[in-house]
């Protein structure tokens, strides 16, 4: 079972992963932004920062940065996209149970976010800019979740498990906290860390990043594609309805968790 093949189990490895990941993600958008501003100035334009970020080149450059991160992490074997402890015959079943796990997680998390008011520094306008166009949609819904799983559950969790093989839960908690912090938004820090616990446990239990990637992609895709009308339905639900739906969702969640726990009990 391995989530990463080249780590030596050192803190310096984790720092290197974070630095490389950050540089790869930031470099293409920064370079493109500079080029856009230079071209604009040469033509006598006066584009402000908002206008620069609204150009179609920016979402494409962010997608490029995320793809570069995936390529580098896989090329360097800092993270491994293998089956781990999952048998080939069980792949489809595992993926389906990962979807069930996400379904059980999604609504309780949404309701908890409403109960626990944590500041959200990402405005609707900024979210629209990040997810605009086909490139933004693909990046946010699919490519970014894959890159984050390679970083946090592959490289970082893989390193931490080598550093503390007898304390996997400590490794899972630390990787979850890092996952929350890198989002740089209070609400995503808090709930991202909780989400990271679930994804970290899933990766550790199965020895594979594939189930956590399925859950992560399902989550981001749902957030991206859920119509505003559906969100209003959730917001306007009565307390009794919320409690009942949350209860049913938790039953689904724990059923999926129990399935994974029994299926991959012995490590």
Describe each PLM feature range.
Residues 70-79, 202-205, 253-262:
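Structural signal for the C-terminal ends of transmembrane alpha-helices
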